[in-house]
Amino acid sequence: MKHFQHIEPNRISLNGKRHYIVPEGLAVSEGLVLPSLTTVLSATAPVGKIMALMNWRKRVGVEEANRRTRMAADRGTWMHKIIEDFFNEQDIETALELSPKYRPYFDAICDFLLTIDQCVLAESAIAYGFDPGFGYTGTFDQLAIIGGQYVLIDWKTSYKEKPDYQLADYRQQLGGYAQAIEQMYGIEIDRALCVIAVYDPEDPESKPSRQIIEADGGELVALGALVRQRTVQYFINHYPGSRPFTLTMDRG
């Protein structure tokens, strides 16, 4: 079995946006300060998407928008922790009993979890570099083996199923993480999945369900190319100085 090193993320903030300092031992130069993949996708989002978000916040009100954003972050953190505990063979029943409002999200993906043969890496940092000296970083959710294939999995939660026009960034996130993992570990990602646990706690008729977005082969390559284009755009329009700089790590 190939060795996969787990890499802890080293996050910093530049102009209020998340970046990482590249650790040693990777193909990308140590100490480079690169934007996270989610930062790249957020900062280079089409105007229409930005306007839609602003209109939503205006429609529901700032207080309600902030409440929903906090709830989404909280349930996402809980979901990632319960999945991690599941694969580490921890006692998850206690956690499920202590968080009944989140349990439906786990129920939505429980049978899918059983199709995963092995969790290879989880919550591990990536760094991807490409000419002419640009790159991005991030933390992917899970690299797994399903049916003898390497499969990248991104876990998400949602109140409702997402329409296709809202999934472009989810797909590009898969492509970005996949090409980074391939560069770092010298493997081929056969499939990439975004698994969304869907449940609306404010709808008494809502039942747990899931939505799966899948990309493989040529589509992943094309998605990765789009991510590279948006990364260059990020450096030109948002990165201090428009070129990657290096921070020297104090090992003392």
Model-derived segments and their meaning:
Residues 1-137:
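Metal-dependent nuclease catalytic cores that hydrolyze phosphodiester bonds in DNA/RNA
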Residues 124-233, 238:
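Mg2+/Mn2+-dependent nuclease catalytic core
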Residues 15, 24, 30, 47, ...:
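Feature targets compositionally biased, intrinsically disordered low-complexity regions
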Residues 99-103, 197, 201, 243:
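Solvent-exposed, non-transmembrane amphipathic alpha-helical segments
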